[in-house]
């Protein structure tokens, strides 16, 4: 609804607001799942308004869904390697899984299927995005479906991604205070409009 936003490089931005305020819709517009009714979206100086999700991913935009996608026939290691775009060794793959609170040896060769819980899939997806090192990574309510201990470990993952990946940005859709606390900038959405932009203070 006439939203105008700029996400700067090297920033961790939290988008928050009450239920139904348009947070997830905005995330899907950024990723290319939905198209805006009007206006334009620019990424690295390029108009990507009419570019779909696959081509946006190729440009360097990563997205973690509220309900992670299953990849039958692929193992967890396969997915992490595909995401990274490089051949990675077992130790590297294990590190990405350990960072999100999963015991790597129990998961590395498991198929990404219905045998995994929603919380496990969520953490695997976040490990994939950490391996991908996108220019812009969007997390849509990453806390959904995971326990408190796992959520605390995710905070550390976001901080690590933020500190290690230069010239890139992270956008997290969330109302969790711990996420707002680590954000460089907070965008408050209310009824589909930007109500405020600034730091938590």
Model-derived segments and spans:
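Walker B catalytic motif
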Residues: 138-142, 149
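Q-loop/switch helix immediately C-terminal to the Walker
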Residues: 67, 73-89
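ABC ATPase C-loop
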Residues: 129-130
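ABC ATPase NBD coupling module
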Residues: 47-62
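Conserved ABC transporter NBD signature motif
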Residues: 39-46, 59, 92
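Helix-to-loop junction immediately C-terminal to a conserved catalytic motif
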Residues: 31
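The feature captures the beta-strand-to-loop junction immediately N-terminal to the Walker
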Residues: 16-18
